[in-house]
């Protein structure tokens, strides 16, 4: 598995600025249909072409982050994480007008830097059928799920935000904002 791919170009005139999200929204999006590509190409979901049921049979079960604003979970690079389930989408908004004006002849590019983990629902992944145990900074990635998770200050955030149950073969969901029941059938 790849941990990181990076390509850097040395450009001494480039200035790097940092923006924090001004708002967050975790919500249901659906499952992107896969693009028609060659058999040796990776599966590439299309964000615009959405279906309500997943193309796979098993979803890791456990407590996922509830829908709505999740600002406290991404406010710091700590052990507080947004637990995004399959079909979910996290929208981040930024105030780009807070950056300095672009000098003439220059252009601005944005790069989203994230810190997180991805867990596959794979029989070859330890505890691949469950959301928990949650990962943490400094864990032994090769032993994840075998060593106990230490207590962290961010555990209170998980108690507050991870209140949405997702499970295997779970095609029903609850619309958090309206409280009305929706089904993917």
How should each PLM-predicted stretch be described?
Residues 2-185:
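Activation corresponds to long, low-complexity, non-globular regions
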């Amino acid at each position: 598995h790849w941990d990181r791919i990076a390509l850097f170009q040395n450009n001494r005139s480039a200035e790097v600025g940092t923006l924090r999200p001004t708002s967050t929204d975790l919500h249901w999006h659906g499952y992107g249909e896969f693009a028609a590509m060659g058999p040796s190409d990776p599966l590439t979901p299309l964000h615009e072409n959405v279906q309500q049921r997943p193309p796979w049979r098993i979803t890791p079960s456990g407590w996922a982050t509830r829908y709505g604003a999740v600002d406290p979970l991404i406010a710091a690079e700590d052990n507080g994480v947004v637990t995004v389930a399959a079909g979910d989408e996290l929208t981040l908004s930024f105030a780009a007008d807070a950056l300095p004006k672009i000098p003439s002849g220059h252009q601005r590019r944005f790069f989203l830097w994230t810190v997180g983990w991805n867990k596959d629902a794979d029989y070859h992944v330890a505890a691949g059928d469950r959301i928990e145990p949650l990962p943490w900074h400094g864990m032994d990635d090769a032993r994840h799920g075998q060593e106990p998770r230490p207590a962290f200050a961010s555990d209170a955030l998980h108690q507050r935000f991870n209140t949405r149950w997702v499970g295997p073969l779970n095609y029903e969901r609850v619309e958090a904002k309206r409280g009305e029941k929706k089904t993917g059938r």
